[in-house]
Amino acid sequence: MSKVTTVFIGALVLLLLIENGFSCTNPGKKRCNAKCSTHCDCKDGPTHNFGAGPVQCKKCTYQFKGEAYCKQ
């Protein structure tokens, strides 16, 4: 059972690294809802206030027809 748990935790860590990526050498600094291709395009972008305080969009998520947009 401990091997299964170790493999599961390792897989979760790997997925987090893939989703969030490693450090960006040249952040794109795009705003929220801007088109992007990787999370580095959105990193260090301007903060926005959507009514719940300042938010910085850091993730590049796919939504429509394979197009990706910067989201929080």
Curated annotation (Swiss-Prot):
A GO molecular-function annotation: toxin activity
GO cellular component: extracellular region
Alphabetical keyword list: Disulfide bond, Neurotoxin, Secreted, Signal, Toxin
Purpose: Probable neurotoxin.
Covalent S-S links between cysteines: 24-40, 32-57, 36-60, 42-70
Annotated localization: Secreted
Claim: Signal is one of the keywords in the record: yes
Gene name linked to the record: HT1
Tissue note: Expressed in salivary glands.
Protein name: Holocyclotoxin-1
Signal peptide (from-to): 1-22
